[in-house]
């Protein structure tokens, strides 16, 4: 019964096995081998059941087939202890390329794929292949792998693996098949990093018939970016595989991932299927990767004199602090890393490559360093160890590659020879690499193979917290120079940042700006809603962190915020200027009325200082006065005066307000007496009737806001007091009597017209008598002891008691340096006040210019009179010494003692009452004058800056004119004239005009003047005399004479008729701006030495007067045409240089031919020294000399930078005549680099991308740029690309740009590409320069020091770095931008002139051909009427051209053949299209200043015109005009041209056709 029972059980088991086999066969889970194995196991079990029950029956239960899962999900999770999980692990482990990968991969979760449709498709494909007669080895099932993410995993599980998921093209097009990995540990191109996690998708595949493909790396890499590379699928095949796939033996091998791929595809009837059916998803396994060593073995117990604890915790986490390469004498030993178990700290930052070439014996090291530092137990603590004053840290060196025995061989050598490798570090530090076994016997017994790295240094490398750093006792507060108000703006910024978190209405910076303005506005207005943000102090306790890493926080918004900041950083920026503007807009100043009481908070400090300097009695008196006066007190007035002074200052530099009421200190009085005197004077002020604020403002030049409240009572009182004072102080009895009469009449009401005339009379008196009597120095204060001509000592003391703060404030406005050089200056103290004493009767003339009550003076009486023509007592001659501060009289005045100057100034300064009353309600020296002065000062400063930048010598700058009214100037309106003041420049213009006329009449050479009424001759002669300097002045300033002479010459020639008032006015303004002080000084000196001046003027004016006589006889149209012809000839003239090693007949013929054409031979050195931008240089070289001589052209690098330099190669003279020469160095350039630029260890792929993109930007069809790489460097990149990812990326990048023709790989060079040669050498670069001679620039790119290549620049090669090439590209190749400063200077000096036609086109690149036919101007006949302005401008242009050509080409003056009168042809006038007046370009003073030295010799006219090659419609090389031999021939030539203008229009047309 038992036997039957066992048999029945066996049959039942067999039936269940058959059912499970059928089910598994339908699902495709088990193949035929598995079914056969299962049947074998069943049969053995069956046969064993016939006998007794075997003892192995109990263990048989472990192999029972589980019941079919009811889970219908696509991914079914498998437990880690199940049989399916173990089978998947076996599949993975058996598919490793490296056996050590088993310890690096850890698998966590496995999931089986359940997709019946895909499984049936797979089974159907297998049956189809078997039906087609495929071999059994082609039908074998295997497993392949793919690294996927979560999205790909679910898509593949449901739909299968479709084509197009990969970008590789190694085996075929990715759009027609799928790529899968052969090995389970080689899942991507880059090595896996430690800690990487992911999912591996396992596919069950049938390889079928495989196509073996050769490795076409170049084609694959070039087509990898387009995605169209690779082979097409082959019919009747299912897979592509690389032929040398089995050659890959290491994970880090060259292109190991690409070379171990399978390429699966499937053909349908007429197309490739999107999903190969013989690729079936099988399972998904989650993995984690760790590159750790195997568990270390604990060391044996120590035995020796030094005992250390032997227990060691191996669970401690380690930190990798450095990864890189270890090299020995440049040879790679291994890839290694430094690991530490004591903490993530390393004392030094090591480079990626460590070259260890120093070896020291261990015994030598022990003598200098304590041996205890080499023990690992010394460095158990996380802090650095210290013994014997030496700090140390110990790390372990771990080999990273694990593929060779390089490191093990190194360790054996160190152990055997008892050595240590040494690497010197910064700050007297060292790193020792040693094998630990020689140190102690304990390590010798352990036999550990870990190399140790010991860092030793003399100072601790730990960073101390801020709290532990001692603070120095003298703490200097931080200064915010870029924005002093930053402490005010930072709280506003905090407020705006807080508010902007909830405000997303606009860009971030706009929102921040809006809320910042709100905060600042509330702060300024002090609203109730305003709450000031106070910056909290930093808590130093935050420096002490308990743990190294902070607790995790929610950072979901960090990614979006960083992305918006990186791609739109401008939205997070507020410029400093805008922040300052926001602060300035919200500043609130205290508003007040000029006539109301006001108490400025900011001026309390000044008033307190003022009160501190006064005695107690003075303060008490002021308090009494302020209590009596209901309108104002002295403190308020002082504050108001300070404010007005700040507003009215013409320059920002002002003195202390406390010095406002100070008096000039006298040497006769002590400091104490001076202060006491000052207090007494202020006490006298209190006894005077008080003044209102309206009168004070009116006296300072201001106006009341309500004009209807003004009365005339104060004016009458002012006049009465003034006349009384004048009558008492005047010596002349007649004048005193007249003043008394006026005083009696002043008690009655004066008509408005009389008051106006009287006010103007006082103004005229101030102008004529001194015009500078109320000007004081800014750093000094005037003494209030004012004196007139014959006052007694008692009267002087009485006058000294009167003072007025307003007058003193007005006196301090004008600056004394400006006053001394004013274009309309006043008399200085030295001129008005002789040192004889106060009783001198010469002072009477100061009062002779006071008109008495509507007195009328003629025009001649008010005009300036020179010293020679004036009477002894004529006060009009007092102007002669006004001028530059460097005049001898002014120097004498400056060197006098201070009390003399004070005394003289006290004699000429009006009294307190007089000055107070002279300031009427409508003061003429008020606000308008100061506004004009401010504008004038700004203009002067800008002009001085331009002159300094252009290195133009100039004398003391001109000061603003002293503005005052004048009866002789017509008034626009009487009402308007009362409110504003007139600008007194007419008297100065008349003075200048009269002086110029007198100088011209005295010194002009009458015999040289052909027309007395010619404005050109008069202005030229007057200008030369006006700007002439004596010999001693020229010696002291050698360049000043040349500059000002030519500048004034051409500026005056450009002006209109000199006899018109407008012309004189313009000349006066120009002289005042360009050097009036120098001209006045020269005028004074010329009057003192007339014989020197007369002789100098005669010598200087002879050449120009001779030319002027000739030109004055010409018709203006003829002259215009001649000037334009000469201008165009100079514009198209080309200098040349023939470069040859030895002189030959060809070069000599070329030189002679070009010299006959009027061109100039010029060496490159001299051409570079000249600064003329219009010059052009053509360098000619024979074609056969180019390989050996082209790089020896002097200054070749500098010449290439200039666009006006061209190069031509010729074989004979005919090449120049027929335009068949070889153009050299046309445009563009090429770059050659050395090994430092393509070093993968130092250069990143981003830097090269940026460089190549820049090269692509500058490349154009007109200027081709290319990077030429030597074969040696390209080969090295391919070798390093197998192991170095950066090298592979660089190689791919170069290949991409090689297709764009921006990179060229040079062929093999025998001179520099061998291994023992350095590439590129200088000879190689010179050959490349000759080989690519059409490209203009040759650049040698290196990251080394440029000083190591000194000879490269001498051979036309520019040495630069990659960054410098991109940043300074324009400077390297010579791109020049126009000079803005020069344009400003030309606009400033040539205002009102129009631009000549040649100037408008000067910026365009001109034709460099020596015989250019382009741009030949058409022949026109000018029929404009006579215009003096045009003739004067033409004279200036002609003189400029003549002088310029004399200087530039003196060697070509007499080289042409001298023609006879019969050979002379009439010159047809040629003009460039445009107007004929005002279009001639005016040369600057720098160009003409160098030519003035030629003015002192007799200039022959033939020399001036003989070297011009005049252009017609014939070619520049085809015709040569005859030279002029003497002035008579020139006149005949010009007359012939003039006669052509009188012929009918038909003759002009016929003549034009003939030409």
UniProtKB/Swiss-Prot annotation:
GO terms for biological process: negative regulation of gene expression, epigenetic; protein localization to heterochromatin. Residues 61-71 have a biased composition (Basic residues). Keywords: Chromosome, Nucleus, Repressor, Transcription, Transcription regulation. GO terms for cellular component: heterochromatin; nucleoplasm. Residues 1402-1417 have a biased composition (Acidic residues). Residues 1-74, 645-711, 744-773, 870-911, 1390-1462 are annotated as: Disordered. It comes from the Eukaryota. Belongs to the TASOR family. Component of the HUSH complex, a multiprotein complex that mediates epigenetic repression. The HUSH complex is recruited to genomic loci rich in H3K9me3 and is probably required to maintain transcriptional silencing by promoting further deposition of H3K9me3. This is Protein TASOR. It comes from Xenopus laevis (African clawed frog). The lineage of its organism: Eukaryota, Metazoa, Chordata, Craniata, Vertebrata. The gene is tasor.
């Amino acid at each position: 019964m038992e036997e039957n029972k066992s048999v029945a059980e066996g049959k039942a088991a067999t039936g269940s096995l058959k059912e499970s086999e059928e089910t598994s066969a339908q699902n495709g889970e088990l193949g035929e081998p598995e079914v056969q194995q299962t049947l074998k196991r069943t049969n053995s079990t069956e046969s064993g059941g016939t006998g007794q029950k075997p003892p192995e029956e109990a263990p048989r239960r472990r192999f029972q087939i589980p019941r079919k899962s009811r889970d219908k999900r696509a991914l079914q999770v498998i437990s880690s202890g199940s049989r399916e999980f173990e089978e998947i692990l076996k599949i993975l482990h058996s598919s490793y390329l490296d056996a050590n990968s088993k310890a690096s991969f850890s698998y966590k979760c496995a999931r089986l794929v359940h997709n019946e449709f895909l499984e049936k498709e797979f089974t159907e494909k297998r049956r189809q292949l078997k039906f087609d007669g495929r071999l059994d080895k082609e039908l074998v099932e295997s497993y392949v792998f793919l690294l996927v993410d979560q999205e790909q995993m679910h898509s593949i599980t449901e739909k299968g693996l479709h084509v197009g998921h990969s970008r590789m093209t190694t085996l075929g097009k990715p759009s027609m098949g799928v790529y899968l990995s052969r090995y389970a540990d080689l899942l991507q191109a880059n090595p896996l990093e430690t800690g990487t996690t992911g999912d591996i998708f396992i596919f069950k595949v049938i390889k079928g018939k495989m196509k073996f493909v050769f490795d076409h790396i170049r084609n694959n890499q070039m087509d990898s970016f387009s995605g169209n590379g690779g082979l097409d699928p082959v019919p009747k095949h299912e897979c592509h595989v690389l032929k040398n796939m089995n050659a890959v033996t290491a994970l880090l091998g060259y292109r190991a991932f690409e070379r171990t791929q399978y390429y699966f595809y499937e053909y349908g009837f007429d197309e490739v299927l999107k999903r190969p059916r013989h690729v079936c998803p099988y399972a998904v396994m989650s993995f984690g990767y760790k590159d750790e060593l195997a568990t270390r073995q604990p060391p044996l117990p120590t035995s020796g004199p030094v005992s250390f604890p032997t227990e060691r915790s191996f669970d401690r986490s380690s930190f990798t602090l450095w990864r890189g390469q270890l090299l020995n004498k440049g040879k790679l030993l291994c890839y290694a890393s430094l690991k530490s178990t004591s903490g993530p700290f390393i004392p030094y930052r090591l480079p990626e490559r460590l070259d260890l070439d120093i070896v020291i014996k261990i015994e030598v090291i022990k003598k200098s360093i304590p041996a205890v530092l080499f023990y690992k137990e010394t460095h158990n603590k996380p802090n650095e160890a210290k013994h014997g004053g030496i700090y140390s840290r110990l790390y372990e060196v771990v080999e990273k590659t694990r593929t060779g025995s390089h490191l093990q061989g190194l360790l054996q050598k160190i152990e055997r020879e008892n050595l240590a490798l040494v690497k010197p570090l910064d700050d007297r530090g060292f790193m020792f690499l040693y094998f630990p076994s020689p140190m102690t016997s304990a390590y010798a017994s352990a036999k550990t193979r870990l190399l140790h790295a010991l860092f030793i240094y003399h100072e601790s490398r730990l960073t101390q917290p801020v709290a532990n750093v001692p603070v120095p006792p003298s703490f200097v507060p931080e200064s915010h120079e870029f924005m002093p108000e930053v402490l005010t703006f930072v709280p506003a910024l905090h407020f705006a940042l807080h508010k902007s978190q909830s405000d997303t209405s606009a860009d971030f910076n706009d929102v921040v700006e809006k809320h910042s303005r709100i905060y600042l506005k509330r702060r300024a207005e002090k609203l109730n809603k305003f709450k000031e943000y106070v910056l909290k102090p930093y808590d130093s306790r935050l420096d002490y962190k308990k743990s190294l890493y902070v607790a995790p926080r929610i950072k979901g918004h960090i990614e979006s915020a960083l992305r918006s900041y990186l791609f739109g950083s401008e939205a997070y920026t507020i410029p400093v200027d805008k922040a300052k503007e926001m602060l300035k807009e919200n500043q609130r100043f205290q508003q007040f009325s000029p006539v109301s009481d006001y108490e400025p908070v900011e001026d309390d400090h000044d008033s307190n200082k003022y009160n501190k300097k006064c005695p107690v009695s003075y303060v008490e008196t002021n308090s009494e006065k302020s209590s009596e006066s209901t309108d104002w007190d002295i403190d308020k007035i002082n504050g108001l005066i300070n404010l007005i002074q700040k507003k009215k200052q013409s320059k920002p530099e002002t003195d202390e307000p406390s010095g406002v009421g100070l008096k000039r200190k006298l040497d006769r009085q002590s400091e104490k007496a001076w202060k006491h005197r000052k207090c007494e004077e202020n006490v006298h002020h209190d006894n005077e009737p008080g003044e209102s604020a309206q009168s004070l403002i009116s006296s300072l030049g201001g106006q009341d806001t309500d004009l209807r409240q003004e009365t005339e009572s104060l004016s009458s009182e002012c006049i009465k007091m003034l006349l009384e004072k004048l009558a008492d102080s005047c010596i002349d009895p007649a004048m005193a009597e007249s003043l008394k009469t006026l005083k009696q009449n002043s008690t009655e009401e004066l008509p408005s017209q009389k008051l106006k005339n009287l006010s103007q009379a006082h103004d005229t008196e101030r102008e004529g008598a001194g015009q500078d009597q109320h000007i004081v120095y800014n750093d000094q204060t005037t003494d209030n002891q004012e004196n007139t001509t014959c006052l007694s000592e008692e009267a002087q003391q009485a006058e000294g008691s009167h003072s007025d703060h307003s007058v003193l404030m007005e006196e301090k406005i004008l600056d004394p340096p400006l006053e001394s050089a004013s274009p309309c200056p006043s008399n200085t103290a030295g001129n008005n006040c002789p040192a004889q004493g106060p009783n001198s009767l010469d002072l009477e003339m100061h009062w002779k210019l006071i008109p008495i009550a509507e007195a009328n003076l003629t025009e001649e009486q008010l005009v300036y009179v020179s010293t020679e023509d004036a009477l002894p007592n004529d006060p009009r001659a007092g102007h002669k010494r006004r001028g530059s501060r460097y005049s001898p009289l002014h120097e004498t005045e400056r060197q006098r003692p201070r009390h003399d100057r004070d005394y003289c100034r006290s004699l000429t300064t009006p009294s307190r009452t007089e000055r107070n009353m002279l300031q009427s309600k409508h003061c003429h020296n008020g606000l308008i004058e100061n506004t004009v002065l401010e504008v004038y000062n700004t203009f002067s400063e800008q002009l001085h800056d331009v002159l300094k930048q252009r290195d133009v010598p100039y004398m003391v700058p001109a000061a603003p004119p002293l503005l005052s009214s004048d009866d002789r100037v017509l008034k626009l309106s009487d009402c308007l004239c009362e409110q504003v003041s007139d600008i007194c420049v007419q008297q100065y213009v008349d003075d200048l005009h009269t002086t110029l006329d007198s100088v011209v009449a005295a010194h002009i050479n009458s015999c040289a003047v052909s027309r007395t009424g010619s404005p050109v001759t008069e202005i030229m002669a007057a200008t030369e005399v006006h700007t002439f300097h004596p010999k001693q002045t020229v010696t002291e300033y050698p360049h000043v004479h040349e500059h000002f002479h030519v500048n004034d010459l051409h500026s005056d020639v450009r002006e209109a008729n000199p006899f018109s008032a407008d012309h004189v006015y313009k000349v006066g303004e120009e002289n005042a701006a360009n050097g009036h002080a120098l001209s006045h000084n020269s005028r004074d000196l010329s009057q003192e030495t007339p014989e020197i001046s007369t002789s100098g003027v005669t010598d200087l004016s002879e050449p120009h007067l001779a030319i002027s006589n000739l030109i004055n006889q010409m018709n203006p149209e003829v002259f215009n045409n001649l000037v334009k012809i000469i201008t165009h000839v100079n514009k198209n003239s080309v200098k040349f240089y023939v470069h040859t090693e030895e002189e030959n007949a060809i070069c000599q013929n070329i030189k002679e031919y070009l010299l006959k054409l009027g061109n100039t031979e010029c060496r490159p050195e001299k051409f570079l020294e000249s600064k003329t931008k219009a010059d052009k240089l053509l360098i000619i070289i024979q074609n056969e000399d180019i390989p050996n001589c082209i790089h020896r052209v002097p200054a070749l690098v500098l010449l290439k930078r200039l666009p006006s330099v061209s190069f031509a190669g010729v074989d004979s003279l005919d090449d120049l005549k027929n335009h068949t020469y070889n153009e050299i160095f046309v445009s563009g350039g090429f770059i050659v680099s050395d090994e430092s630029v393509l070093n993968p260890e130092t250069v990143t792929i981003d830097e090269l991308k940026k460089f190549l993109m820049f090269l692509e930007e500058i490349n154009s069809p007109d200027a081709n740029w290319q990077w030429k790489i030597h074969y040696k460097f390209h080969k090295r990149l391919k070798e390093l690309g197998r192991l170095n990812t950066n090298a592979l990326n660089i190689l791919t990048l170069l290949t991409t740009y090689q297709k764009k023709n921006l990179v060229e790989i040079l062929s093999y060079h025998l001179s520099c590409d061998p291994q023992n040669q350095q590439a590129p050498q200088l000879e190689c670069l010179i050959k490349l320069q000759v080989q690519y001679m059409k490209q203009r620039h040759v650049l040698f790119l290196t990251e080394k020091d440029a000083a190591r290549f000194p000879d490269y620049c001498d051979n036309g090669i520019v040495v630069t770095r990659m960054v410098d090439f991109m940043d300074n590209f324009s400077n390297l190749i010579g791109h020049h931008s126009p000079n803005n400063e020069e344009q400003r200077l030309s606009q400033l000096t040539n205002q009102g002139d129009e631009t000549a036609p040649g100037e408008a086109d000067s910026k365009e690149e001109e034709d460099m051909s020596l015989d250019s036919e382009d741009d030949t101007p058409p022949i026109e006949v000018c029929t404009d009427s006579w215009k003096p302005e045009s003739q004067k401008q033409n004279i200036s242009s002609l003189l400029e051209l003549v002088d310029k050509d004399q200087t530039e080409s003196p060697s070509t003056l007499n080289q042409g053949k001298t023609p006879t009168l019969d050979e002379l042809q009439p010159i047809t006038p040629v003009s460039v299209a445009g107007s004929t007046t005002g279009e001639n370009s005016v040369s600057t003073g720098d160009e003409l200043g160098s030519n003035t030295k030629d003015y002192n010799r007799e200039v022959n006219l033939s020399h001036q015109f003989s070297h011009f090659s005049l252009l017609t419609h014939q070619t520049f090389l085809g015709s040569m005009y005859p030279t002029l031999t003497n002035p008579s021939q020139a006149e005949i030539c010009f007359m012939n041209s003039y006669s052509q203008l009188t012929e009918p229009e038909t003759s002009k047309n016929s003549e034009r056709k003939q030409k």
